[in-house]
Design a protein with these regions (language model features):
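Bacterial N-terminal signal peptides that target proteins for export
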Residues: 1-11
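Alpha/beta-hydrolase active-site loop
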Residues: 120-147
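A domain-start/cap signature at the N-terminus of enzymes
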Residues: 23-64, 72, 76, 84, ...
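The feature captures the conserved acid-bearing segment of alpha/beta-hydrolase catalytic domains
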Residues: 179, 184-271
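Bacterial N-terminal signal peptides
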Residues: 10-19
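C-terminal catalytic histidine-bearing segment of alpha/beta-hydrolase fold enzymes
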Residues: 238, 247-253, 258, 266-308
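Cap/lid segment of the alpha/beta-hydrolase catalytic domain
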Residues: 104-130
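Structural cue for short, hydrophobic secondary-structure segments
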Residues: 67-70, 102, 237
Length: 308
């Protein structure tokens, strides 16, 4: 299967933890499937909560759009943040027939609130019990089996920390994505082996500490060919012209704010493709009068997802 091959080839990930579905144990149940249309439904999977919206009028070939939320606001849970995202995209899903899946990356298992611990948590595709990218693929596969072709590519959108997830998912699972949009991300995986994952294409061999009692070892070897394949996926990086707050320095990032960091990353990915005989399909759109606002950039994000 294409997605399965991509997981094996995209990264070599060795995880020193006891598997949830180990030898002799019961197999993991499939994620619950929601068939009712026209309503936002909260669903509880073994790895966390996610939200689903099934459009009332579905095309013959169902298209899945995964929305990845940003860092939850103070006093707001990941579940509340994910719910806010999906309700803001319902009209778009109805108009274009997208089935929406919105995972809630909570603090305990995905470090959603703190990007400076657990190697940035879900932003870097990491997770305590299941890696963040693997959870998304688990949910998508289940709904592809129920509503669409199992091998069908899907659409991916993320804002802020969710945009960081999208960038790293893309260079890990390039053949899974039909089109992607990143809105106002602060960091990106740079196309250089001189910077270690999740901030670059260099190898990562590290222990991730989730809490005092839980440590997870990872050995990650990014695959240059998958990164090159990622440059062939249509991707739009959106940043508001007023999104100029100075950010903390992270390895490999070129710039001090989301505006310059995003612009320079696309520029470097285009050059990376050209150096290897390819023409990148990445582009940047700078939106005048907009700051760091998911809702303010939604019309531009939605247009980018539907414009050839």
């Amino acid at each position: 299967m294409a997605l399965y091959r991509q997981i094996l080839l995209g990264f070599i990930i060795l995880v020193s933890v006891v598997a949830l579905a180990g030898c002799g144990s019961e197999p993991l149940p499939q994620p619950p499937l929601i068939h009712e249309s026209g309503q936002v439904t909260q669903v509880d999977d073994v790895f966390g909560t996610f939200y689903v919206y099934v459009p009332t009028s579905m095309p013959k070939q169902q298209q899945i759009l995964v929305l990845v939320h940003g860092t939850p606001a103070k006093e707001e849970s990941a579940e509340e943040t994910a719910h806010y995202y999906i309700v803001n995209w319902v009209d778009f899903a109805e108009e274009h027939g997208y089935l929406l899946i919105v995972p809630a990356f909570n603090q305990e298992n995905f470090s959603s609130r703190y990007g400076d611990i657990a190697l940035s948590g879900y932003r870097g595709l990491f997770g305590r019990e299941i890696n963040a990218d693997e959870w998304v693929l688990r949910l998508v596969r289940a709904y592809q089996q129920a509503f669409a072709a199992p091998e069908e590519q899907f659409y991916l959108y993320g804002h802020s920390a969710g945009g960081q997830f999208v960038a790293r998912f893309l260079v890990t699972h390039a053949d899974a994505i039909k089109r992607a949009v990143i809105s106002s991300a602060a960091t990106y995986p740079q196309p250089t082996t001189g910077v270690a994952w999740p901030f670059g294409m260099g190898e990562l061999h590290a222990d991730i500490e989730w809490d005092a009692a839980t440590s997870k070892h990872v050995d990650i070897i990014p695959d240059k060919q998958v990164w090159l394949a990622a440059t062939q996926v249509p991707l739009t990086v959106l940043v508001g012209l007023n999104d100029t707050d100075e950010l903390s320095g992270y390895p490999g990032q070129k710039g001090k704010n989301r505006f310059t960091i995003g612009h320079n990353w696309v520029k470097d990915m285009v050059a990376f493709a050209q150096e290897n005989g390819l023409e990148s399909r990445f582009k940047t759109e700078i939106i005048p009068g907009k700051g760091h606002s998911m809702s303010g950039l939604i019309p531009y994000s939605q247009q980018a997802l539907t414009t050839p």
